[in-house]
Structure formats: structure tokens, C-alpha cells
Swiss-Prot record:
Gene: disA
Alphabetized SUPFAM superfamilies for the sequence: RuvA domain 2-like (SSF47781), YojJ-like (SSF143597)
Species per Swiss-Prot/TrEMBL record: Clostridium kluyveri (strain ATCC 8527 / DSM 555 / NBRC 12016 / NCIMB 10680 / K1)
Quaternary structure note: Homooctamer.
Annotated DAC domain residues: 6-144
Domain of life: Bacteria
Name of the protein in its database record: DNA integrity scanning protein DisA
Residues that, per the record, bind ATP: G73, L91, T104, R105, H106, R107, T108
Lineage of origin: Bacteria, Bacillati, Bacillota, Clostridia, Eubacteriales
Length: 354
């Protein structure tokens, strides 16, 4: 559920990742120091800005694109990247589109990407750099060894952040079962979850850019984060003001700047608490997060439980008969919920002692 721009960037990087035919062709052009301008798409919008050149209409191969890049013009690939359609073309985008790029090749690439919304790749002849444009996204591809170093460094940072998050969440677990949670405890847990997810998002971009070289990083990442984002969303559902859309709240929290996310007031405002003293305000969870930890409890049953009992405390104090009366819960499931919550509480208290 990360922001759309990040999702779009990841999808672009997957197309250009090491190990793909496209990336092999780009690396060949880079090593030859010829420079190049490549458009990934053949829609009507693109063909409107294409002038001159000649039709190739041949199967894509890294060696073909390398040879064609020796000519000055742009190369047009089909949308599925399987064919080279045109070579040595001139691109004539709308000159009124603003761009802050300097070289002719990069200015053209930026304008074409903004005008058509397709991926345009500019390979610098002098600086030996591959730059990718799409809409208002600009990304410079880096060497795999540099990316691996950055990814490993980010993983080490993530490990420390996850350790802090675990302590904060364990504390929240105990307070929830004792029904003495304050807004400060909740906002701290949500803040820590968001900080972890921001590092995760950064590492995911590195993994996309590394392609098949990022497998080990991906495995380590999955082992570290497990259900962090899901639990964070359940926290929002547990504590946001009634009738607020939790997806919208999560989106707002993601949009908070890196500096402002350190301030709990920004998070509490997104959750619907304005001008409320965080440390002194007690609040009870609805119970989504704890119920999600009980095996084989569908989302509809969780919704029905929260609708009927309002708070986790009430669900825990309900008898088997009370639970049985809730829609979607029979005798067996009532027992599973009651026993599941009891075991969860015991486990959390035991873990805290050690």
C-alpha cells in the first residue's frame, strides 16, 4: 500500500533490472560509450512526436539495439519490448513543456516522457550514466555493486528499527490486555511501524534495481518484516476515530514528510485526534489486531465481533453464549476465539517476564 509513485518506480525498475534482455542491451551501449535515446512504447501519442528515421520491425536483441545506437537518432521499441520498430528517428516533443535537464538528449527524453507518459531512457555518452524518465519520474540507474552495498547497509538499519518496533509493540500488547493504553503508546507504535515501512520501501527499490542479484536481499527482508505492515493497518483500525476510513488514514500517514513523522502530533491528527493530550488520554482497542492473531478467523467475523462488542475488553469478557450469538460464529468458533485470546494473553505475559 505504499504510495503510487513508488509502485510505479518499482514496476519501471523491474523492466530494466540486471538479467533482463533490455538491461543487457543498455549495458552494451553504456560500455561502447556511444550514448543513446530509447523509447519503450509505440502508441499513437509517441508516433506523433517521431520524425524521420527508418522502420526496422525486427525482433529485439541486445546486440541489435547496440548496433542501432551507433546512429544519432532515437530507437523506438514496441510496448511489449519484443520488437525494435524504428531507429535513427528524431523526437520532436512540445518545447513548452518545462525541463531542468541540460543535455539535448536528456531534455528531449524528459519532455517526451512528460508528454506521452511512456518510459524513455537516455544514455549519456560522456558521463556513462543511464537515466530513466516516465511522466514526472526521473531515476538514474546505478552499478549493481553500489546498489548491493546500499541494500546491505539499509538492511542493517532496518534490523535496528525492527528491534525497537518489537519492544514498542510488545509493550502495547501488555497494555491492551490490561486495558490501560494511552494515545501516546498507540501513536508511538504507529510511528515506529511507518518508519520501518519507509526503510522497507527503500530496500524494495534496491531489490527491483538489482534484479536477479537481489534475491538474497529479498529473502532477508521478508524474514525481517513478516507482518509489520498488516499489523500497522490493524493498529489504525483499532484506534482511529469512529467512521474514519482506515485506508485513507494510512495513505495520509505515508504522505507525512520524514521530518514530520518524528512528531506524534501529525500522526494523531491523521487518526482524528486534534488537540488531545497524548500521554493522559486512555483509549481502548477495538480488537482487530489481537483477533487477527487467532488462526482461521475470517475478516467478516472480526468485523461482526467489533460491531457487536465495540472493544477488545468486551470481547474477552463475553461468554461463549454471547460470542455464539454473533453472526458467523458457531459454538466451535466461539470456543476458538475465547481460548485463542486467553492463550495470547498468557503468552504475552510470559514473554514479558523473560
Amino acid at each position: 500500500m505504499r504510495l503510487e509513485k513508488e509502485k510505479e518506480l518499482k514496476s519501471i525498475l523491474k523492466l530494466l533490472a540486471p538479467g533482463t534482455q533490455l538491461r543487457e542491451g543498455l549495458e552494451n551501449i553504456l560500455r561502447a560509450k556511444t550514448g543513446g535515446l530509447i523509447v519503450l512504447g509505440d502508441s499513437e501519442q509517441i508516433l506523433k512526436v517521431v520524425d524521420g528515421g527508418f522502420a526496422i520491425n525486427s525482433e529485439y536483441s541486445p546486440s541489435y539495439i547496440y548496433e542501432l545506437a551507433k546512429m544519432d537518432g532515437a530507437i523506438i521499441l514496441s510496448s511489449d519490448l519484443k520488437k525494435i520498430l524504428y531507429a535513427n528517428t528524431q523526437l520532436i516533443p512540445d518545447s513548452t513543456i518545462p525541463t531542468f535537464e541540460t543535455g539535448t538528449r536528456h531534455r528531449t527524453a524528459d519532455r517526451v516522457a512528460k508528454q506521452t507518459g511512456v518510459i524513455v531512457i537516455a544514455i549519456s555518452q560522456r558521463r556513462n550514466v543511464i537515466t530513466v524518465y516516465r511522466g514526472h519520474i526521473k531515476y538514474v540507474l546505478r552499478d549493481s555493486s553500489v546498489m548491493l552495498g546500499r541494500a546491505n547497509q539499509a538492511l542493517q538499519t532496518l534490523e535496528k528499527y525492527v528491534a525497537v518496533l518489537d519492544r514498542v509493540v510488545n509493550n502495547l500488547n501488555i497494555l491492551e490486555f490490561q486495558d490501560i493504553v494511552t494515545l501516546f503508546d498507540v501513536m508511538t507504535a504507529i510511528q515506529r511501524t511507518e518508519m520501518v515501512m519507509r526503510i522497507v520501501s527503500e530496500i524494495e527499490i534496491y531489490i527491483c534495481e538489482l534484479g536477479n542479484e537481489g534475491r538474497l536481499i529479498s529473502m532477508q527482508l521478508n524474514e525481517l518484516i513478516k507482518s509489520v505492515e498488516r499489523d500497522g493497518i490493524f493498529m489504525i483500525r483499532d484506534y482511529c476515530q469512529t467512521d474514519m476510513d482506515y485506508d485513507e488514514i494510512y495513505r495520509q500517514i505515508q504522505e507525512i514528510s520524514s521530518d514530520d513523522v518524528l512528531n506524534l502530533d501529525f500522526i494523531s491528527r491523521a487518526m482524528g485526534y486534534v488537540g488531545v493530550p497524548l500521554v493522559d488520554t486512555l483509549i481502548s482497542p477495538r480488537g482487530y489486531r489481537m483477533l487477527s492473531k487467532i488462526p482461521r478467523i475470517p475478516a467478516t467475523v472480526m468485523d461482526n465481533l467489533v460491531k457487536n462488542f465495540k472493544e477488545l475488553k468486551e470481547i474477552m469478557e463475553a461468554s461463549y453464549e454471547d460470542l455464539d450469538r454473533v453472526e458467523g460464529i458457531g459454538e466451535a468458533r466461539a470456543r476458538a476465539i475465547k481460548n485463542g485470546l486467553r492463550r495470547l494473553r498468557e503468552q504475552i505475559m510470559i514473554d514479558n517476564k523473560f
